[in-house]
């Protein structure tokens, strides 16, 4: 069976669409930055995921583009990316800050010249604001002291917010593998297991079934750690009656949806059952609100009202959805100030996190917006039989 992935022609089309937006915005060139931890914007164009070092993509208004990498990644990038213009730029070196005294690297000016961008008083757009470090920004300023440098994250949001059929296929395949891993972990859940042992079960399963990597650090944590909105699994030993939060994710061509559900190792107490059931109801309520044309802020505001009407305002932390794609959580979020309408083929994680002083829980799955609702991109609905208790 053919491997599910993004074809080279689609990557080329992304560069072309970006170049058009660069020109419309009055920019001469766009610089997009990424890292091993958050590669989404740079991989969107290059299909390259850096290791240790950072990377960048430069796209000129004329459609020419280059991948910029650190000194150790030139051959690596040349083998993994479809881009044939790979430039070593010192500002993308690793955090150990090696000097590489024998290396002659290129400057941003050298790279831009290769793209046909000349002159001193140019206008440079920089995207991935939170992934652009001061070394990269200062490198641009040193090369172009007379340039106008502006943030251009709006270009990336415009490009990435609507998913192609190939992107949705990657999300579906990653979710299929994640579902297998979730079932494998539940089959191994019992008192005496550590959280990290369960992570190992999930990792083994996703690689055996075709994932390129974990989509996020696998969540398998119990009891008080379930209060963490984000966390890491530990050496904690799981005990009978513990509520265990699973949030697993496989990665396919970079696309990293997750499936999250709370599982009890044994029988739930009534307190836990009530909160788990409320979270599931809030999750299903959210799913029913999603369709093209609805304002994201309206869903977010009414989501909070749902908690308030149930007397659960103290259990609210955030929600109800965030974008998903090349990273498990990406823009846009659905928040009370998110005044944009939902559009077909926008993809989100319905992320229903409920917290309390002693434990928390999350029901989560990937969906795609349709004209009259949304479609679940996971292979099956979560929580169909209510709160999950694993017999041990």
Residue ranges and their predicted role:
Residues 1-392:
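Active-site neighborhoods and metal-handling regions in enzymes and metal-associated proteins
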């Amino acid at each position: 069976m053919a491997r599910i992935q993004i074809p080279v022609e689609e990557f080329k089309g992304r560069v072309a669409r970006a170049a058009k937006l660069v020109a419309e915005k009055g920019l001469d060139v766009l610089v997009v930055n990424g890292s091993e931890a958050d590669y989404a914007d740079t991989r969107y164009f290059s299909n390259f995921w850096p290791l240790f070092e950072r990377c960048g993509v430069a796209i000129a208004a004329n459609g020419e583009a280059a991948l910029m990498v650190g000194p150790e990644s030139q051959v690596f990038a040349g083998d993994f990316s479809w881009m044939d213009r790979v430039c070593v730029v010192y500002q993308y070196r690793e955090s150990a800050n090696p000097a590489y005294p024998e290396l002659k690297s290129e400057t941003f000016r050298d790279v831009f010249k290769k793209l046909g961008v000349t002159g001193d008083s140019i206008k440079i757009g920089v995207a991935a604001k939170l992934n652009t470090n001061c070394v990269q920004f200062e490198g641009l300023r040193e090369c172009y002291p007379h340039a106008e440098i502006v943030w251009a994250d709006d270009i990336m949001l415009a490009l990435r917010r609507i998913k192609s059929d190939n992107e949705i296929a990657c999300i579906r395949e990653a979710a299929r593998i994640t579902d297998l891993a979730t079932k494998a972990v539940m089959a191994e859940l019992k008192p005496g297991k550590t959280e990290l042992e369960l992570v190992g079960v999930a990792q083994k399963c996703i690689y055996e079934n075709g994932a390129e990597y974990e989509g996020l650090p696998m969540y398998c944590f119990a009891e008080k750690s379930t209060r963490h909105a984000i966390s890491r699994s530990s050496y904690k030993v799981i005990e009978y009656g513990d509520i265990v939060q699973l949030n697993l994710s496989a990665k396919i061509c970079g696309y990293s949806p997750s499936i999250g559900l709370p599982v009890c190792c044994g029988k739930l107490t009534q307190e836990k059952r009530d909160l788990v059931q409320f979270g599931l109801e809030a999750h299903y309520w959210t799913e029913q609100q999603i369709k093209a044309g609805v304002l994201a802020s309206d869903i977010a505001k009414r989501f909070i009202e749902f908690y308030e009407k149930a007397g659960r305002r103290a259990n609210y932390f955030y929600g109800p959805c965030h974008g998903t794609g090349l990273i498990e959580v990406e823009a846009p979020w659905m928040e009370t100030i998110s005044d944009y309408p939902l559009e077909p083929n926008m993809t989100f994680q319905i992320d229903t996190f409920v917290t309390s002083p002693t434990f928390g829980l999350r029901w989560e799955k990937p969906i795609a917006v349709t004209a009259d609702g949304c479609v679940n991109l996971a292979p099956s609905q979560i929580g169909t039989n209510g709160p999950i208790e694993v017999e041990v």
